[in-house]
Amino acid sequence: MKKIFTTLLLAVITSFAIAQNATLKIKFVGATDQKVTIQLPLDVTRFYPNREEKSFDQDSTLVFSFKADKISLIFIKNSGKTFKFLVEPGQVSLQLKPKNKVEEAIIYQGANQDGQIALNKKNDTFYQYRASNYLKLDSTVNGLIALMDADKAKELQVFKTLLAQKKISQPFYTEVKNDIEMDYLATATAIPIQLFFDSERANSKVVFKPEFKEWWGKLYAAYPFTNLDDLRTAEFYYHAQYYSDYYKGMFLPQQNGTYIKPDYNDVNARLKVSYDGFAKNFSGKVREYLLASFLFNEILQEKYQPILLELLADFKKQYPNSKFYPSIKPGADKIIAYHESAKRDFAADQKFVANYAQINTLDELMAEFKGKTVFVDIWATWCGPCKAEFEYGEELEKFLKSKSADMLYISMDKDLADTQWKEMIKYYKLSGNHIRVNPKLLQNLMDKLWDGKGYSIPRYLIIKDGKLVIDKALRPSDKDKLYQQISAHL
């Protein structure tokens, strides 16, 4: 009898262990890229850097498993399209067509099938944009609350109906409901923030009315940052950051006369103020999550500030067993490597355009390259997408050299970033010719390439014999397509 009981107990334990995993079999149809990026939960939170890169096999199928003690939100990115699913423990068979509309792109065989489609169709407009749009519709607190409540109820009704029809589970509905409610809470608090900053601008005619000041405080008081379920929602980090940086860090001190404005030209000072704000204004697991998210987000900007190493060391000291730390550490290693490279001299093939500070127009700059075909990369030290393209620079450099073509990098940075500009040339090993714009050249580029009022980068050009032949060239990541485009002008 004892042996039978033991056998049954082992069977139950084994079954329970299996049930705590989710296994997905995904068939990709019409994908243009074999690479698949999967973002998984970490320590029951939505933590962006907890991602894995995989590739599907020859028949375009990918099978992977992950620990799933409860329903888990995962993201799957392929061929420029991101899908999200709330996956319960067990087996899931999935077909994805990245190039199709949502209704046709997903065939989900598993729990909450109809809910998965609705989840991918849900409005994901960034909450700050929503706040701006609501402000265009009404200028009173009560009016804005009514508008948002109506929209929130409409979004929730889709999933309430599915729940009533037993097409989604209660855990699925709860996760979606939490995310929608956080989205609208973040939107609501973003409205006073926008009015606060608009009223602070020089010569501003915007009045930050008392009713909005009162509403701002009431929102935070009614929804304190203590619910761990919020750590799985899309907007929680930014919602908490605005509370810490602007409500607690600026508005309240201004109200009671204790505000001391940091020197925001000192990036290190800004980072320290924000980090200390998170440390002071939150507690427990929420505090750990927010500090980790802050460090990752700032390291991700790839500005390589040394103070981030100090702050990460402090985080490690406070949370020696944090599950978030391993995802942040590789970024810290890049900061160390960056400052090591900054000590070195420029490579022989890293050259600066002669008297570049005196070049005021694109025509003057192009005249420096008569008789040459030149691929031009317009970038800046603060531009993440620009720096992401540097990954493909070595292959591009080989192609250009084989064709006796030149490379020109135009930095849109201001004088304050001069040192960092030169350091990044070394760190990213940017072989070719370099120039940083002065105010006149900046304006001339905006006039010629954009609308004269602003610009968007990265931007790529092709020059031949001192003349602009393509003003919107392909990116280095386009590889062969770009090489063909350049070859047409050799």
Q: Locations of the language-model features?
A:
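Short pre-active-site segment immediately N-terminal to redox-active cysteine/selenocysteine motifs
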Residues: 372-374, 378-382, 414
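Bacterial Sec-dependent N-terminal signal peptides
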Residues: 1-26, 489-490
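A non-transmembrane, solvent-exposed segment enriched in polar/low-complexity residues
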Residues: 20-175, 179, 187-188, 227
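Conserved segment of the thioredoxin-like fold in thiol-based oxidoreductases
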Residues: 398-442, 450
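Thiol/disulfide oxidoreductase modules built on the thioredoxin-like
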Residues: 430, 439-487
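N-terminal, charged low-complexity regulatory/assembly segments
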Residues: 142, 146-273, 277, 281
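N-proximal helix/coil linker or "cap" segments that precede and/or mark the start of modular domains
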Residues: 296-372, 423
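Conserved redox-active cysteine motifs that mediate thiol-disulfide chemistry
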Residues: 378-395
